[in-house]
Amino acid sequence: QAVIVDKEISKEFEKLMKEADCYFLNKEETEKLEKSMFENEKLKSEIAGQSPYNIAKAAGIEIPEKTKVIVVPQTGIGPGHPFSKEKLSPVLAYYIVPNSDKGIETAEKLIEFGGLGHSAVIHSEDEETINKFSNRVKVGRIIVNSPSTHGAIGDIYNTNMPSLTLGCGTFGGNSTTANVSSVNLINIKRVAKRRVN
């Protein structure tokens, strides 16, 4: 889970996130959280499903109990940067980019490092940027101008099949990019009789 924001709107974004009870870590807090959340760059199993307050407390960081998301400013992606992977928790890596092209490039790198085939979200009013993003990012779902989690699982904000099991296709080593439902679990027998086409 990461958010990539154009520098031009980053201050406004940060203000809105803080108003929504998100907590931005400083450098020292980021180092503490990294040591607490990861072991050999792998997410510790006890982190998944924990509240932001409990995650921060375990790292020795004081944050308001009402915090909804911990935001971790980042610049790097890949080995040596564990926050650039999936975190299964209310912890967001935060990247500031100079323009939409760099934003798309950053999204591609994040997906390549950990998330091929899953889901990506773009908030933009520029159709050209949306199309570029959609064509380049290797995921099974592109969610446009909608909340990411509820957009990806379908039905509430779009016509995607409602599901909590999201296929990642061949990008992610799965057989489908669909939101998996009962349709994917039914065996259908096809009887084919000879005919001249």
Question: Where would I find each of the regions flagged by the language model?
Answer:
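Short cationic amphipathic helices and targeting signals
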Residues: 1-5, 91-94, 120-122
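Short beta-strand and adjoining strand-loop segment in the mid-core
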Residues: 2-8, 169-171
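NAD(P)-dependent aldehyde/semialdehyde dehydrogenase
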Residues: 8-11, 15-116
